[in-house]
């Protein structure tokens, strides 16, 4: 039980750090993080589109982030590495944030989702799924799922080959949740299948 509680605690801590960095580094095109314990402390890899925003002038910003991770989140001797995202169209967190920003600007949810899927697929993704949930058109909350191509749903391929991201859009009707799953072009399944090109599909479910 002690080991289970430790992993739960560490998982919650990583989630809180992720939420903080998402807000703090939004202009940098934040795309997630990876935290690993090392003999020297804690290695924190931050994935962004624009590394300069994270490093700051003379390294000021990255030193500030290091202090916050150590003092506010109790990370032991955090060592931050900043890694540039090579292709943001395959980073689900970046795409979820972009979609949420489009919704906040007043773009209709269906138009925003279709545009995102077309852009992601045209860059070579094997599959993409977008789910937008909340009060989309009226008082009743519902969830709309848009998808094209192939996304692994279960087993090791779903855990290792699929990029997943989540963001929130704050609108007058309330908060919308945006979930994005992307299977990049280099994802290879154990039992390779041929993917037949299909148009974007849509499903609606009441909440």
From Swiss-Prot:
Transmembrane segments: none annotated. The keyword Cell membrane does not apply. GO terms for cellular component: cytosolic small ribosomal subunit. GO terms for molecular function: rRNA binding; structural constituent of ribosome. Residues 17-86 form the KH type-2 domain. Pfam families: KH_2, Ribosomal_S3_C. Keywords: Ribonucleoprotein, Ribosomal protein, RNA-binding, rRNA-binding. InterPro entries: KH_dom, KH_dom-like_a/b, KH_dom_type_2, KH_sf_prok-type, Ribosomal_S3_C_sf, Ribosomal_uS3_arc, Ribosomal_uS3_C, Ribosomal_uS3_euk/arc. One of its GO terms (biological process) is translation. Binds the lower part of the 30S subunit head. Part of the 30S ribosomal subunit. PANTHER family: 30S/40S RIBOSOMAL PROTEIN S3, SMALL RIBOSOMAL SUBUNIT PROTEIN US3. Belongs to the universal ribosomal protein uS3 family. This is Small ribosomal subunit protein uS3. It comes from Thermococcus sibiricus (strain DSM 12597 / MM 739).
């Amino acid at each position: 039980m002690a080991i289970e509680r430790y992993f739960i605690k560490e998982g919650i801590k990583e989630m809180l750090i992720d939420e903080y960095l998402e807000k703090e580094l939004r202009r940098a095109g934040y795309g997630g993080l990876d935290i690993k314990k090392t003999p020297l402390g804690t290695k924190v890899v931050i994935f962004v589109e624009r590394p300069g925003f994270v490093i700051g002038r003379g390294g000021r910003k990255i030193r500030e982030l290091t202090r916050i991770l150590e003092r506010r989140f109790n990370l032991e001797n955090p060592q931050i590495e900043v890694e540039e995202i090579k292709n943001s169209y395959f980073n689900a967190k970046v795409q979820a944030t972009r979609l949420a920003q489009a919704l906040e600007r007043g773009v209709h949810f269906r138009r925003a989702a279709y545009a995102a899927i077309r852009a992601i697929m045209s860059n070579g993704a094997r599959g993409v799924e977008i789910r937008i949930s909340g009060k989309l058109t009226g008082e009743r909350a519902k969830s709309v799922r848009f998808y094209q191509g192939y996304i692994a749903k279960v087993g090791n391929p779903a855990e290792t080959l699929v990029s997943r991201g989540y963001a929130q859009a704050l609108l007058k009707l309330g908060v919308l949740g945006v979930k994005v799953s992307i299977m990049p072009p280099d994802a290879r399944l154990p039992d390779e299948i041929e993917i037949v090109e299909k148009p974007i599909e849509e499903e609606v479910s009441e909440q």
